[in-house]
A protein has these predicted regions:
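Hydrophobic alpha-helical signal peptides and transmembrane signal-/tail-anchor segments
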Residues: 1-8
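Condensing-enzyme catalytic core mediating Claisen C-C bond formation in acyl metabolism
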Residues: 23-76, 174-246, 261-262, 266-274
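Active-site-proximal alpha-helical scaffold in enzymes
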Residues: 131-158, 197, 231
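Short, well-ordered, mixed-charge alpha-helical segments that flank or form enzyme active sites
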Residues: 112-114, 164-169, 213-218, 255
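Conserved beta-ketoacyl condensing-enzyme motif
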Residues: 41, 75-135, 242-257
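Short beta-strand segments
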Residues: 42, 106-107, 156-162
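Short acidic, glycine/serine/threonine-rich loops at helix termini
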Residues: 52-54, 115-117, 167-172, 257-260
Length: 274
């Protein structure tokens, strides 16, 4: 038995469950998938704004701008421009053309993913619009990796972006309003990143994908993003922390903590920094 589901502009084909081979051999535990054909990272690029240029991670950016509008007339258009720039840079570094990508998985923090959809429309690449807030980069990499592992794509791009001024208008107060920021307020990055995955390459490889779960601790302060994200640190063992936070962020935490008389050395997996 075969049936077809029409979902908006896309078409999803599904077959009777008896005709589909079991995927249980790919699952490890409750939320992790082991990829039998791990895709390789073949190119990546990123871009940041003025605050990022002044921050401790400035040397890790491929491109930095002191213009929060990136030559555009609105901040929303600026965010779209960032996405377009990073995808083109990643393509150029891999010596690829837009037509060489089978899919692009991208998202941002705006309604209807307008940062992604307007920024990437000229590429003409099959597009999955994602909304995972701060997890969008991980979500896009996960889905792109599974598309390639499943044999549905040879190359796919994972993209995300955020912009301080667009995020403030989306979630809190428009910047021109001049609202006073409370002590708990975080600063949303003005930045974008793109990673291109392929079914063949020198690595690094994405070998496993873990999907998180929704945790609601009742945090109602829209300014305090740190409190909303804190539960993940409680559940992680030290040896797994770097897989989520990243080596750069761990190194930065050590530097900042040491300067204030605190340390995470011995608490998290920091052997690579000794």
């Amino acid at each position: 038995m075969t049936f077809i589901i029409f979902l908006f502009a896309g078409t999803l084909w599904a077959t009777h469950k008896n005709e589909v081979s079991s995927m249980n051999e790919k699952r490890v535990g409750k939320r992790t998938i082991a990829l039998s054909h791990p895709p390789s990272v073949i190119s990546y690029a990123n871009i940041g704004g003025r605050q990022e240029a002044e921050g401790p991670l400035s040397s890790y950016f491929d491109e930095l701008s002191d213009d929060s509008f990136f030559g555009e007339k609105t901040w929303e258009k600026a965010e779209s421009t960032m996405q377009k720039k990073v995808v083109q840079r990643a393509l150029d570094q891999a010596k690829l053309k837009p037509g060489d990508l089978d899919y692009i998985c991208a998202g941002d923090l705006l309604n209807q993913c307008i940062g992604s959809s307007f920024g990437l429309r000229d590429f003409g690449i099959p597009f999955y619009g994602l909304y995972g807030a701060c997890s969008t980069m991980g979500e896009s990499l996960s889905l792109a990796a599974m598309l390639i592992d499943g044999g549905y794509a040879s190359r796919a791009a994972a993209v995300t972006s955020s912009h301080f001024c667009t995020a403030e208008r989306q979630y809190r107060m428009p910047v021109p309003y001049g609202n006073q920021r409370p002590p708990t307020a975080q600063w949303t990055a003005t930045a974008a990143g793109c990673t291109i995955l392929a079914d063949d390459g020198p690595g690094p490889y994405i070998t496993h994908v873990t999907c998180g779960k929704i945790v609601d601790r009742g945090v109602s302060d829209a300014n305090n993003m740190g409190a909303a994200m804190a539960p993940v640190s409680v559940k992680l063992t030290p040896s797994k922390y770097n897989a989520v936070c990243g080596l750069v962020s761990t190194h930065h935490s050590l530097q900042q903590g040491g300067a204030k008389g605190a340390t995470v050395m011995g608490t998290h997996n920091t052997n690579h920094l000794k």
